[in-house]
């Protein structure tokens, strides 16, 4: 009879422990019920990116002096800079500048180390295409300013997402 009583007490302790674990899980579930949703409905709602967001690179052709610092600091030697040396004035003249965003890792080194600030990061992050060759941007495509999300009246912009408290 004694082992039967201990088994019954063990069963009672296990039942209480299981109820406690279920209760803890239920409390955690209920604590998440009053939080705001973290996800957004993407094509119809867009987030306003932060000030230091690393999006598509914007290039200003007139400011570039063809020094190739951007190529030297790039971890994958990505920017292609074509220039011609003008012998009469002993300066380089930029002919072509291109970046392939299919390969770019958006590290921002080229923007940071450019001595003339002809490169800058934009807030544009929608670069997807059906053909990878369309991601190779020349100086004309790089010089195009992105359309602002705030100006598009068909898209609801979300300024702040609720922060997750840990």
Swiss-Prot record:
Protein name as catalogued: NAD(P)H-quinone oxidoreductase subunit I, chloroplastic
Encoding gene (name): ndhI
EC class of the enzyme, as a word: translocase
One Pfam family this sequence matches: Fer4
Domain 4Fe-4S ferredoxin-type: start-end pairs: 55-84, 95-124
GO molecular function: 4 iron, 4 sulfur cluster binding; iron ion binding; NADH dehydrogenase (ubiquinone) activity; quinone binding
Domain of life, per lineage: Eukaryota
Residues involved in [4Fe-4S] cluster 1 binding: 64, 67, 70, 114
Membrane topology qualifier: Peripheral membrane protein
Cofactor note text: Binds 2 [4Fe-4S] clusters per subunit.
Subcellular location: Plastid, Chloroplast thylakoid membrane
HAMAP family on file: NDH1_NuoI (MF_01351)
Assembly behavior: NDH is composed of at least 16 different subunits, 5 of which are encoded in the nucleus.
Binding-site residues for [4Fe-4S] cluster 2, renumbered to this chain: 74, 104, 107, 110
Primary role: NDH shuttles electrons from NAD(P)H:plastoquinone, via FMN and iron-sulfur (Fe-S) centers, to quinones in the photosynthetic chain and possibly in a chloroplast respiratory chain. The immediate electron acceptor for the enzyme in this species is believed to be plastoquinone. Couples the redox reaction to proton translocation, and thus conserves the redox energy in a proton gradient.
